[in-house]
Amino acid sequence: MRWMDAPRALAVLALLLLGACNKRDGLSSRDAAALTGGDPHAGREKIREYGCDACHTIPGVPGADALVGPPLAGIGGRMYIAGILTNTPDHMVQWILDPPALDSATAMPNVGVTEEDARDIAAYLYTLTSGREPPR
């Protein structure tokens, strides 16, 4: 696990606090990239590549309207990931990398996502709002 330096930790805290003030709005692509170290535009493509759209409804991803897993609109504004992890960028990346390692009872499989791709996917997810298209 990577540890954040103090300035980055403060930036993450500030962004999370801003998100807590207005849970309906996702982050801008630039803020999401700074928060996660990933590329939200690449993350949108990786979501399809890894088949996330087969189980989840994901705004901005054509055809991602499945109802097996929870809908991901507004996930960046939720307090918890999968009901067990506080919603932080590092936890989001860890969850995307290997869900069963964090919750053996989860139905979400480990699909072999690389750390770089997990950061990109996390960046995209943090741009999602509560139902509207993500920022471009």
Residue ranges and their predicted role:
Residues 36-38, 45, 63-128:
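Extracytoplasmic electron-transfer domains, predominantly the class I c-type cytochrome c fold
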Residues 22-48, 135-136:
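Electrostatic cytochrome c docking/interface patches
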Residues 1-10:
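Bacterial N-terminal signal peptides that target proteins for export
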Residues 52-55:
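Short cysteine clusters
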Residues 17-20:
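C-terminal motif of bacterial Sec signal peptides marking the signal peptidase cleavage site
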Residues 27, 61-62:
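Short, non-ligating residues that shape and space the ligands of small metal-coordination modules
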Residues 129-135:
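Short, low-complexity, Pro/Ser/Thr/Gly-rich segments in the mature regions of secreted, periplasmic
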